[in-house]
Amino acid sequence: MGTNTLVKEFVGRKDHKDYIKRGTAAENLLAEEGLRRGYIVKPSSEKQNMYDHIDLILTKGDKKFTVDVKARRTGTDKSKGFDDLWTVVEFKNTMGDSGWLYSKSDYIAFERKEDFVFADTKQLRDMCESIVDVTKRVASFRNANYKVWGRSYQGKKDLISRIEMSKVVALDKTFIWLKNLDKNE
């Protein structure tokens, strides 16, 4: 991963420690990619991050956009590593409030092995609301493809689903930034 530390690691939720580390690393890697492309990259304020789901603000000339960065996710079997074919979408967060699908960011950027997929937030939300059956609640994350699952057994109020990344990539406002995988340039 990159060496940029523009985004500082969030301290708090011990139950998400590893995911927070991965998330911060993904945010910093995307920040590096933005800088490499000539953008001015600024981290969001703590308030923007917590309440608006905005991680980074990118500016280049008169073009400015905000991003909520999602680190690579493991699939339904964590022992098999990362799954770039499917991703998680969050309708409600662990507190039961609007999840990051209802972000105020312009884009949700999904990290994959070799790139970042930028999905227009409204377009992604509209698609998810039409293809995910939020009335079909399943008992296991393994069964949450286009259905919803939550961790109420842990006292959490989240509502999440899994969708295929190919559907995100197919959205007409989606764009992709390849990662600079060769750091020896």
Located regions from the model:
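Non-catalytic C-terminal interaction segments of nucleic acid-processing enzymes
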Residues: 2, 113-185
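Short, acidic/polar N-cap/turn motifs at the starts of alpha helices
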Residues: 53-55, 86, 105-107, 148-150, ...
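Acidic-basic catalytic patches of nuclease active cores, encompassing PD-(D/E)XK
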Residues: 2-47, 73
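Conserved catalytic cores of phosphodiester-cleaving nucleases, focusing on short active-site segments
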Residues: 34, 56-58, 63-75
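Hydrophobic beta-strand residues in large extracellular and virion-surface proteins
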Residues: 30, 39-41, 56-58, 67, ...
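Catalytic cores of nucleic-acid endonucleases
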Residues: 9-17, 43, 70-122
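Beta-rich nucleic-acid/ligand-interaction surfaces
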Residues: 47-57
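Short connector loops at helix/strand junctions that flank enzyme active sites
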Residues: 51-53, 62-66, 102-105
